[in-house]
């Protein structure tokens, strides 16, 4: 039981950092641009397809990933310029409808370019095996790499937001974008850059997800709702809140799906427990969100606004 708990805790952490990669861009976009954006799930899918294709073309896993990230950034920039710039002064319902349309557009575009069949991305031998995280506790090397990449990205985002001039502009735009614009900040360029960065983070999540699952149309959409839960729990506009909430949601979901069926087997039939347990684990996330909002209506770490 102890070894299983350790393994599933690492799985929960890996799922959490994957959610953080999506939620980080989502919370920046909503916090700074006041834009309700439903397209990150599609950008996860685009990142996965680009990475899989570029890995196949170059024959190098690392080179494929390195080329796919700026490619996804470019996709995000194009989406912001062509579609989103017309939505900033519109109400949130218009933004929801337009970005939902982006989901349909990207799904059909993927089917036209790559076809409806799933793609599969292999791993290089160096990260396809297992490593011992503790004596007698093997863990997949690629999942461990995802955790490390997620932690490094979290540190990088914190450094950019807290320690650089770009971060100062981002924080100024989040606090009071009208005042920042009056002081000479190019808000349009800032919005484009922020959305592009958010797209590249979502794309990176897709690149990491691709080798774990099949790459197929709509693959990022189930993660979108959880990413929204993450930013609501953590606090809209807060990178620190997004990271902590993503880890909490990842652990609750993963541990709940493994251990709730085991607990229920002592009360109900095994088949019933195996069906009800994962459903209860999914419910726990939303119960947790509701409980936190009762006591912290703006989330655990709300961004400061002026």
Predicted regions mapped to residue ranges:
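Membrane-interfacial amphipathic/re-entrant helices at transmembrane-helix boundaries
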Residues: 1-21, 50, 58-64, 90-95, ...
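Transmembrane helix-bundle core of multi-pass membrane transporters
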Residues: 86-163, 190, 255-284, 298, ...
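Membrane-embedded helix boundary and interhelical linker motif in transport proteins
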Residues: 10, 32-78, 82, 263-273
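Short, non-helical or kinked segments that cap or interrupt transmembrane helices
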Residues: 24-48, 89-94, 166-169, 187, ...
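Alpha-helical transmembrane segments within multi-pass membrane transporters and channels
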Residues: 59-102, 109, 244-249, 253, ...
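Hydrophobic core segments of alpha-helical transmembrane domains in multi-pass membrane transport
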Residues: 48-53, 69-75, 102-110, 149-158, ...
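Transmembrane alpha-helical segments in multi-pass inner-membrane proteins
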Residues: 59-70, 192-202, 206-207, 212-286
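Helix-loop-helix "hairpin" substructures at the membrane interface of multi-pass membrane proteins
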Residues: 15-16, 136-220, 239-244
């Amino acid at each position: 039981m102890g070894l299983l708990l350790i393994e599933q805790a690492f799985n929960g952490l890996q799922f959490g950092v994957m959610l953080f990669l999506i939620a980080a861009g989502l919370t920046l976009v909503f916090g700074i641009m006041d834009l309700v954006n439903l397209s990150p799930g599609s950008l996860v899918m685009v990142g996965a397809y680009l990475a899989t294709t570029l890995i196949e073309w170059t024959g190098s896993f690392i080179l494929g990933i390195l080329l796919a990230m700026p490619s996804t950034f470019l996709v995000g920039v194009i989406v912001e310029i062509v579609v989103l710039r017309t939505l900033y002064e519109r109400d949130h319902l218009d933004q929801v409808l337009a970005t939902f349309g982006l989901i349909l557009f990207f799904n059909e575009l993927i089917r036209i370019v790559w076809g409806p069949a799933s793609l599969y991305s292999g791993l290089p031998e160096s990260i396809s095996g297992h490593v011992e995280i503790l004596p007698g506790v093997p863990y997949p090397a690629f999942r461990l790499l995802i955790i490390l990449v997620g932690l490094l990205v979290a540190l990088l985002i914190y450094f950019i937001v807290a320690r650089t001039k770009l971060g100062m502009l981002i924080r100024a735009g989040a606090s009071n974008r009208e005042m920042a614009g009056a002081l000479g900040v190019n808000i349009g360029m800032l919005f484009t850059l922020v959305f592009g960065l958010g797209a590249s983070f979502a794309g990176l999540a897709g690149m990491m997800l691709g080798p774990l699952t099949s790459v197929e149309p709509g693959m990022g959409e189930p993660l979108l709702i959880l990413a929204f839960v993450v930013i609501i729990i953590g606090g809209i506009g807060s990178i620190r809140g997004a990271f902590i909430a993503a880890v909490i949601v990842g652990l609750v979901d993963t541990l709940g799906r493994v251990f709730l069926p085991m607990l229920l087997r002592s009360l109900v039939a095994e088949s019933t427990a195996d069906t009800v347990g994962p459903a209860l684990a999914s419910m726990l996330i939303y119960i947790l969100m509701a409980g936190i909002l009762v006591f912290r209506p703006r989330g655990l770490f709300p961004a400061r606004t002026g």
